Curated annotation (Swiss-Prot):
<dbReference type="GO" id="GO:0005886">
    <property type="term" value="C:plasma membrane"/>
</dbReference>
<dbReference type="GO" id="GO:0046933">
    <property type="term" value="F:proton-transporting ATP synthase activity, rotational mechanism"/>
</dbReference>
<keyword id="KW-0067">ATP-binding</keyword>
<keyword id="KW-0997">Cell inner membrane</keyword>
<comment type="subunit">
    <text>F-type ATPases have 2 components, CF(1) - the catalytic core - and CF(0) - the membrane proton channel. CF(1) has five subunits: alpha(3), beta(3), gamma(1), delta(1), epsilon(1). CF(0) has three main subunits: a(1), b(2) and c(9-12). The alpha and beta chains form an alternating ring which encloses part of the gamma chain. CF(1) is attached to CF(0) by a central stalk formed by the gamma and epsilon chains, while a peripheral stalk is formed by the delta and b chains.</text>
</comment>
<dbReference type="InterPro" id="IPR038376">
    <property type="entry name" value="ATP_synth_asu_C_sf"/>
</dbReference>
<dbReference type="Pfam" id="PF00006">
    <property type="entry name" value="ATP-synt_ab"/>
</dbReference>
<dbReference type="Pfam" id="PF02874">
    <property type="entry name" value="ATP-synt_ab_N"/>
</dbReference>
<dbReference type="Pfam" id="PF00306">
    <property type="entry name" value="ATP-synt_ab_C"/>
</dbReference>
<protein>
    <recommendedName>
        <fullName>ATP synthase subunit alpha</fullName>
        <ecNumber>7.1.2.2</ecNumber>
    </recommendedName>
</protein>
<keyword id="KW-0139">CF(1)</keyword>
<keyword id="KW-0406">Ion transport</keyword>
<feature type="site" description="Required for activity">
    <location>
        <position position="373"/>
    </location>
</feature>
<dbReference type="GO" id="GO:0045259">
    <property type="term" value="C:proton-transporting ATP synthase complex"/>
</dbReference>
<dbReference type="InterPro" id="IPR033732">
    <property type="entry name" value="ATP_synth_F1_a_nt-bd_dom"/>
</dbReference>
<keyword id="KW-0066">ATP synthesis</keyword>
<dbReference type="InterPro" id="IPR020003">
    <property type="entry name" value="ATPase_a/bsu_AS"/>
</dbReference>
Length: 513
């Protein structure tokens, strides 16, 4: 066989032309130090702030400190088997979590991975955990209510859709109970809920999930969990993950409610990370950007206008506004609301609900102190009937607390003062409410109407609860149409007032409590 040199050269040329250089450019570095969940990496170039760094064993760390010759990163998960000299590489990605309707009814960790044993989640995509909040032009004023189901809150400290209302108090004052009841009350309202548990015991969270399931609210709720035993990085990021899951509904013209339980533990986790990264400590050893930690999170709770929703959905959803309402929880130490983190969050939010240990221990539950609790924007969103009827409730309670303190020193009181004290006592008693028993707008309206129009005057203090229960049972059976109208419209006019008065007059005649 004779070889033709021309054919050989043509074949070689053809092979050379077809040859493709396949090269993978990887930004790789070496771990130079590992301690307490923090790794220091040398040799990485082009790293972004907050970028995910791939570690051995299919784990990730997040780059938080970008220094001249090294990168400080916090490990997302266990770190005991990491060692100096191991290779790591950049991913070019910022941390993202799954979002969508498939998360409703599920319990997930900070990274959006299911931990409830119900199989994989059918998500609609991914969203970055850190998102810039909507601007001023994209927002709409708050004018629709979020009913918590608590008389004390809905009448005196109303919450609107898109508002940030802080729940603050010492440990064991009913903060979580109030937030969980608010979630339970949304099961028929169309508001989707996200409950973020930060730094709590796994048994406590399991109990919350069980209660939500028992009351039919879990199907409407996403539970995001970062327990006390998990890495500080996961506790720090959990609220941001939950917020991204809630924003999915807001940006599509729906309403969502998110509870952060609690942001004190998130601040402690962030302080731990910052100190380990050797960032300079400030007041109470918190880093200088702890205000920004919470402000950038809570500013994402907002009501957005129809133009924003239409633009976000590429015209699929038109003429609908969306909202994300936040109920951040802060735990105080011995009632000290002037500590660093509480004052920060008070200044960021649109109002606060103060829960007091003394009130809780005296049997007043929810233990709301109406004197120092406030809602800065909720008044514009309050249901008409409750707004009209509850005007005197806050005044009555404030005057009662003042007079009760004064009457301890005064021996004889005039009739007007005594009447005020008695009215205040009855209103205080009426504001008591059992856990897991949120009330409808109509039920609240009937109770407040009875207090405002003097129907409690002849009722003994220890019978107020029985009086209310019997009254609501009577009104819902004998005046079902009136109650249905109030629930559907929320209006207050002469017909509704006449119907309530007639119903109460007839009930009082029966003396069946």
């Amino acid at each position: 066989m004779q070889l033709n040199s021309t054919e050989i050269s043509d074949l070689i040329k053809q092979r050379i032309e077809q040859f493709e250089v396949v090269s993978e450019a990887r930004n790789e570095g070496t771990i130079v130090a590992v301690s307490d969940g923090i790794i220091r990496v040398h040799g990485l170039a082009d790293v972004m702030q907050g970028e995910m760094i791939e570690l051995p064993g299919n784990r990730y760390a997040i780059a938080l400190n970008l220094e001249r010759d090294s990168v400080g990163a916090v490990v997302m998960g266990p770190y005991a088997d990491l060692a100096e000299g191991q290779k790591v590489k950049t991913t070019g990605r910022i941390l993202e979590v799954p979002v969508g309707r498939g998360l409703l009814g599920r319990v997930v960790n900070t990274l959006g991975q299911p931990i409830d044993g119900k199989g994989p989640i059918d998500n609609d995509g991914f969203s970055p955990v850190e998102v810039i909040a909507p601007g001023v032009i994209e927002r709409k004023s708050v004018d629709q209510p979020v009913q918590t189901g608590y008389k004390a809150v809905d009448s005196m400290i109303p919450i609107g859709r898109g508002q940030r209302e802080l729940v603050i108090g010492d440990r064991q004052t009913g903060k979580t109970a109030l937030a969980i009841d608010a979630i339970i009350n949304q099961k028929d309202s169309g508001i989707k809920c996200v409950y973020v548990a930060v730094g709590q015991k796994a048994s406590t969270i399991a109990n919350v999930v069980r209660k939500l399931e028992e009351h039919g609210a879990l199907a409407n709720t996403v539970v995001v969990v970062a327990t006390a035993s998990e890495a500080a990085a996961l506790q720090y990021l959990a609220p941001y993950s939950g917020c991204s899951m809630g924003e999915y509904f807001r940006d599509r013209g729906e309403d969502a409610l998110i509870v952060y339980d609690d942001l004190s533990k998130q601040a402690v986790a962030y302080r731990q990370i910052s100190l380990l990264l050797k960032r300079p400590p400030g007041r109470e050893a918190y880093p200088g950007d702890v205000f920004y930690l919470h402000s950038r999170l809570l500013e994402r709770a907002s009501r957005v206008n129809a133009e924003y929703v239409e633009k976000f959905t590429n015209g699929e959803v038109k003429g609908q506004t969306g909202s994300l309402t936040a109920l951040p929880i802060i735990e105080t130490q011995a009632g000290d609301v002037s500590a660093f983190v509480p004052t920060n969050v008070i200044s960021i939010t649109d109002g606060q609900i103060f829960l007091e240990t003394d009130l809780f221990n005296s049997g007043l539950r929810p233990a709301v102190n109406p004197g120092i609790s406030v809602s800065r924007v909720g008044g514009a969103a309050q249901t008409k009937i409750i707004k009209k009827l509850s005007g005197g409730i806050r005044t009555a309670l404030a005057q009662y607390r003042e007079l009760a303190a004064f009457s301890q020193f005064a021996s004889d009181l005039d009739d007007a003062t005594r009447a005020q004290l008695e009215h205040g006592e009855r209103v205080t008693e009426l504001m008591k409410q059992k856990q897991y028993a949120p009330m409808s707008v109509a039920d609240q309206s009937v109770s407040i109407f009875a207090a405002e129009k003097g129907y409690l005057k002849g009722v003994e203090l220890n019978k107020i609860g029985d009086f209310e229960a019997s009254l609501l049972s009577y009104m819902n059976s004998e005046h079902a149409d009136l109650m249905k109208t109030i629930n559907e419209t929320g209006d207050y006019n002469a017909d509704i007032e006449g119907g309530l008065k007639a119903g109460l007059d007839k009930f009082v005649e029966t003396q069946t409590w």
